[in-house]
A protein has these predicted regions:
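Extreme N-terminal starter segment of soluble prokaryotic enzymes
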Residues: 1-4
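Rossmann-like NAD(P)(H) cofactor-binding subdomain of soluble oxidoreductases
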Residues: 86-152
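Conserved N-terminal Rossmann-fold NAD(P) cofactor-binding segment
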Residues: 32-71, 85
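Conserved NAD(P)H cofactor-binding loop of Rossmann-fold oxidoreductase domains
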Residues: 77-79
Length: 248
């Protein structure tokens, strides 16, 4: 049994619920939202396609009391970034939302592992830790998991290779102050600095990487997606589900 509660059924929360269902790592998923009808609709929509994924997961909308016994609770609630807006500009509003949710959810799921996905994620994770009184090892921010995935995607595009062969990481705070420790970055064990000589396309020579350009690209990726489609939710949802998989 692996019960997961998701608070917030906007684009990110709903996509996490759907993805968890397809991954088959949850036996029960509870959706909680201030907009009860939205939560009911998302649960129904996912549930009605469940037969294509084994049909073993119980998915339903509920209230905080329904989170009792959850192994994992994922917080996605809060306002989302608008085009041109920074994550830090969301801080006070989303801090207030997190503080209002915190006592209600921890009352019923005091032993759960909490994954904070809402932005600004590092600030909200710290607030949740300080306000909840829960052990530090029960609270996880999604942090730079998404940034790392974006970096690997960019490097895989650059060298035309599978993303799973890229072993590079983004450290620090999620967003503009993050950084890449290039000295440990490698592709299938080959240090990244040696890759231009070793990874080539017939008739072409790969130019040396511009580390600063790559880091800037990664930092601006979220804003680039928001400018084009209004919100980011697929990649961040995949990052949240990856954390759940690691805990499974």
């Amino acid at each position: 049994m692996n019960k997961i509660t998701i608070i917030g059924t906007g684009s990110v929360g709903a996509t996490i619920a759907y993805t968890l269902n397809t991954m088959g790592i949850a036996s029960e998923i509870v959706l909680i939202d201030i907009n009860t009808e939205k939560a009911l609709g998302e649960a129904l929509d996912i549930r009605q396609g469940n037969s294509f994924f084994g049909g073993n997961c119980s998915i339903y909308a509920g209230d905080y009391c329904d989170a009792a016994g959850s192994n994992i609770v994922i917080l996605t609630s809060g306002i989302a970034r608008k085009p041109g807006q920074t994550r830090l500009e969301l801080a006070q509003t989303n801090v207030n939302i997190t503080k209002s949710i915190l006592p209600q959810i921890t009352k019923y799921a005091p032993n759960a592992i909490y994954i904070i996905v809402s932005n600004p994620v590092d600030i909200l994770t710290y607030v949740f830790f300080k306000q909840s009184g829960l052990p530090a090892n029960h609270i996880i921010g999604s942090g730079t998991v998404l940034d790392t995935s974006r970096l690997r995607a960019r490097l895989s595009e650059y060298y035309n290779i599978n993303q799973t062969n890229v072993h590079a990481y983004v450290f620090g705070e999620h967003g503009d102050s993050s950084f890449v420790p290039w000295s440990v970055a490698n592709i299938s064990g080959v240090p990244i600095k040696d890759c231009p000589q070793l990874i080539t396309t017939p008739g072409m020579i790969s130019p040396a990487l511009d580390f600063a350009e790559i880091e800037t690209y990664v930092k601006k990726s979220g804003g680039r997606v928001i400018a084009r489609k209004g919100a980011t939710f697929y990649a961040v949802s995949a990052a949240g589900c990856h954390i759940c998989k690691c805990l499974h």
